[in-house]
Amino acid sequence: MLAFLFPGQGSQRPGMGRPWRDQESWELVEEASAISGRDVGALLLDADADTLKDTRNAQLTTFVSSLMVLDAVERLGLEPSVCAGHSLGEYTALTANGALGFDDGVRLVIERGDAMHEAGTQSPGVMSAVLGLDDDQVEVACRRADADVWVANYNALGQVVIAGSPEGVAAATKHAKELGAKRVMPLPVAGAFHTPFMAAARDRLRVAIADAKPRNSD
């Protein structure tokens, strides 16, 4: 069994499309540009870190890059038995296994990015990864902060992401270090994702998902 796991927002980096520019799979970038009305190629080739940090750009480029890599792998005759994803990567996985068509996937990711960008503008926030504490200790750090900060992702043993207001995350970071965290790393994202700060995006995204009409896949 071959399983593919697709990444979420925050994995983007400047120039990440350059190794793929002359590959056949680059045609997906051109298709995504036509569907979205955005120059996805320019974002993948030339955008700086701040431009890619914009939620609208980060989600679209990560989604398209992931499917471009998948296309290249499938051209070698390898196909996944199972697809899964982390946050945004769930949408990539749904497209990879045929539950969403590529067009619908691009449009849905654009809507998701726009909705989350707007929510992040209304309620500015940040995210950080806490390394070296167990889940309970990170939760304690958030409670001790007594501010708008929550556990957003339980990524792995000893790696938990917190998110919230800049002040809340700063306070929780202080408490996490006092509890013995090895490191607290700010993430290159432009919002407090997976928290109540994203409530404004929820209803808009629910409608977009229904309109996309995901289908059952084998």
Which residues make up each language-model segment?
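Alpha/beta catalytic cores of group-transfer enzymes, especially the acyltransferase/condensing modules
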Residues: 9-11, 36, 97-218
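FabD-like malonyl-/acyl-CoA
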Residues: 1-138, 183, 187-188
